[in-house]
Amino acid sequence: MKRSFLSLAVAAVVLSGCSLIPDYQRPEAPVAAAYPQGQAYGQNTGAAAVPAADIGWREFFRDPQLQQLIGVALENNRDLRVAALNVEAFRAQYRIQRADLFPRIGVDGSGTRQRLPGDLSTTGSPAISSQYGVTLGTTAWELDLFGRLRSLRDQALEQYLATEQAQRSAQTTLVASVATAYLTLKADQAQLQLTKDTLGTYQKSFDLTQRSYDVGVASALDLRQAQTAVEGARATLAQYTRLVAQDQNALVLLLGSGIPANLPQGLGLDQTLLTEVPAGLPSDLLQRRPDILEAEHQLMAANASIGAARAAFFPSISLTANAGTMSRQLSGLFDAGSGSWLFQPSINLPIFTAGSLRASLDYAKIQKDINVAQYEKAIQTAFQEVADGLAARGTFTEQLQAQRDLVKASDEYYQLADKRYRTGVDNYLTLLDAQRSLFTAQQQLITDRLNQLTSEVNLYKALGGGWNQQTVTQQQTAKKEDPQA
């Protein structure tokens, strides 16, 4: 008996080291080894001393007003709060799954008192029997001989790690969204002020044309042309008044609270609002993009689930064991000779399951293939977002300079047309065309500047930036990794 028990224990220890989880191999990145090159992309310096993902958002965003708004959003945004709670929930799920590897030991106390009728009693007379017991032990503890429970534990661990990356992704998205909403608000405020100024100019021209018309110098056509310019500017003014209000509402939603009243003075759109970040190499994205890391953890979780599905084909052994004391009298539980013990192993060997085990294994493998495709798609999406950002960086500088030159030329055109109209050399149609050309060019300059800024924000996010508040240097990273530093 002792030899059989010892053999069983040795076999359990040996088999407990078995794992049926397939060896994990990271899929090859389905993108080029370098970002696109060409006229649109400018010069890419390659590997960066400090990766963009390690540059703190307080260093990237130079506007103190925007910095404070991002801080408010990180404290109050509900989506970010849900992401953090999801991490806690999956951490608890992992702890639950890990606990199944160990026996659950508890104390059981029981007591029964039963009356048997005479026809069931061995003596032929009614009898009352009593039994009391206290035991310490475990019930139905599964010996993880083929790694099923360890596979489920590893799967839960990878899912927990995936939610951590999802939280990180939610934060980087929130930081970029707050910045975009803030920049959009500033741009629409600039458009609103430009429209007010333009409306004032149109109104002065209309008043001048009205006086000229009253004395018979200007025609009715000139007067109506001036009026159309005024009414068009009024409509545009109402549009930007609405957009500014909606931009503020969108910002409040992202902040999770009202816009603070004591914000510091912000920077203007024409000032240096952002720090240029290095692009690095595509291989950096595999370790820096939280959505890619999340997809990889989900892939590793699916890989672990294959091990659990394989282990289901093998026997499962459960153990119930306890030791304690039993007695007919409650007062005799701890008397000499009242000791008791139970050792009850059980084995379950699947023989016929109507194909369910094979189907479960096929399902686990298909899920892994799905996760491989999702992981590769995440890499491709990241590569495209970075490439688009680099193309925007390489062309917006030239576009903005050309647009500024257009505004300058349009302003000179307007000044000349206004002078010629006032001296009677040219008609009002030329002046109206000059006014509209200048207004359109100024509007487009604001729009182009907003697009340039948002493209830089999106590039920062695409490179994994927005998680750290302060820049993390390589020395700081090394200290974190070295416990003796």
From Swiss-Prot:
It is a lipid-anchor. A lipid is attached at residue 18 (N-palmitoyl cysteine). Induction: By growth under severe iron limitation. Disruption phenotype: Disruption of MexA, MexB and OprM significantly reduces active efflux of N-(3-oxododecanoyl) homoserine lactone/3-oxo-C12-HSL/PAI-1, but not N-butyryl homoserine lactone/C4-HSL/PAI-2. It is found in: Cell outer membrane. Keywords: Antibiotic resistance, Cell outer membrane, Lipoprotein, Membrane, Palmitate, Signal, Transmembrane, Transmembrane beta strand, Transport. A lipid is attached at residue 18 (S-diacylglycerol cysteine). Transmembrane segments: none annotated. Its main location: membrane. It holds the Pfam family OEP. The keyword Acyltransferase does not apply. It comes from the Bacteria. The keyword Signal applies. Export of antibiotics and solvents is dramatically decreased in the presence of the protonophore carbonyl cyanide m-chlorophenylhydrazone (CCCP), therefore may be driven by a proton gradient. Antibiotic efflux is inhibited by pyridopyrimidine derivatives, such as ABI-PP, acting by binding to a hydrophobic pocket in MexB. Residues 1-17 form the signal peptide. GO terms for molecular function: efflux transmembrane transporter activity; transmembrane transporter activity. One of its GO terms (biological process) is xenobiotic detoxification by transmembrane export across the cell outer membrane. GO terms for cellular component: cell outer membrane; efflux pump complex; membrane. Component of the MexAB-OprM multidrug efflux complex, composed of six MexA subunits forming a hexameric tube, binding to a MexB trimer, which interact with the trimeric OprM outer membrane channel protein. The OprM homotrimer forms a 135 Angstroms-long pore. It consists of a beta-barrel, which is probably inserted in the outer membrane, and an alpha-barrel formed by alpha-helices which probably spans the periplasm. In the ground state the periplasmic end is closed, while the outer membrane end opening is 6-8 Angstroms in diameter. Belongs to the outer membrane factor (OMF) (TC 1.B.17) family. The outer membrane component of the MexAB-OprM efflux system that confers multidrug resistance. Functions as the major efflux pump for n-hexane and p-xylene efflux. Has been shown in one study to be involved in the active efflux of the autoinducer N-(3-oxododecanoyl) homoserine lactone, thereby playing an indirect role in quorum-sensing; but has been shown in another study not to be involved in efflux of this autoinducer. Over-expression of the pump increases antibiotic and solvent efflux capacities. This is Outer membrane protein OprM. It comes from Pseudomonas aeruginosa (strain ATCC 15692 / DSM 22644 / CIP 104116 / JCM 14847 / LMG 12228 / 1C / PRS 101 / PAO1). The gene is oprM.
